[in-house]
Amino acid sequence: MASVEKLPMLAEGYEKLTAELKALREERPRIVDAIEEARAHGDLSENAEYHAAKERQGQVEATIADLEDRVSRAQIIDPTTLSGDKIIFGATVTLLDDDEKPVKYQIVGPYEADAKKGMISYNSPLGKALIGRKVDEEIEVTVPSGDKFYLVQKIEFI
């Protein structure tokens, strides 16, 4: 039997997933009602409301299945319980870029990543380059605009 790959995530990411799942499950009956109402309007071949409701139902069901899968595989990680001198999932890292300007990122799961909030996926090019690194190590990352160089300045588990 194949093992199920766990999805590491922070508690906040798990809460966001479960909230989205709950909202979609609550939307299900409204979609069924919309389909029934549209059906009552007669000819389904030219019934835009019916086709829109059926399309939305398909989208919602697919998203629910995806979210249920992710929730079932979730492995919640609390960064405050971690320690060490290497960058791992959940670590908050301060880097110095080419201009010696400090930038701070937290290593998170792919579904939690939000670069604007300083949260990068361990699967991203920068995330992959950081995992396993220590303070004072230099890393090189190839991004669409070219190669970027960083120096690991600090590793925290907060």
Swiss-Prot record:
> What name goes with this protein?
Transcription elongation factor GreA
Which biological process annotations from GO are given for this protein?
DNA-templated transcription elongation; regulation of DNA-templated transcription elongation
Q: Name one GO molecular function term.
A: RNA polymerase binding
Task: Give the InterPro entries listed for this entry.
Answer: GreA/GreB_C_sf, TF_GreA/GreB_CS, Tscrpt_elong_fac_GreA, Tscrpt_elong_fac_GreA/B, Tscrpt_elong_fac_GreA/B_C, Tscrpt_elong_fac_GreA/B_fam, Tscrpt_elong_fac_GreA/B_N, Tscrpt_elong_fac_GreA/B_N_sf
Tell me which domain of life the UniProt entry assigns to the organism this sequence originates from.
Bacteria
PANTHER family reported for this sequence: TRANSCRIPTION ELONGATION FACTOR GREA (PTHR30437:SF4)
Q: What does this protein do?
A: Necessary for efficient RNA polymerase transcription elongation past template-encoded arresting sites. The arresting sites in DNA have the property of trapping a certain fraction of elongating RNA polymerases that pass through, resulting in locked ternary complexes. Cleavage of the nascent transcript by cleavage factors such as GreA or GreB allows the resumption of elongation from the new 3'terminus. GreA releases sequences of 2 to 3 nucleotides.
> Gene3D superfamilies given for it?
Transcription elongation factor, GreA/GreB, C-terminal domain (3.10.50.30), Transcription elongation factor, GreA/GreB, N-terminal domain (1.10.287.180)
Give coiled-coil spans as residue ranges.
5-75
Lineage of the native species? Bacteria, Pseudomonadati, Pseudomonadota, Alphaproteobacteria, Sphingomonadales
| Pfam families in the record | GreA_GreB, GreA_GreB_N
Q: Which family does it belong to?
A: Belongs to the GreA/GreB family.
Checking HAMAP family in the record gives: GreA_GreB
> Could you tell me the keywords of this UniProt record?
Coiled coil, DNA-binding, Transcription, Transcription regulation
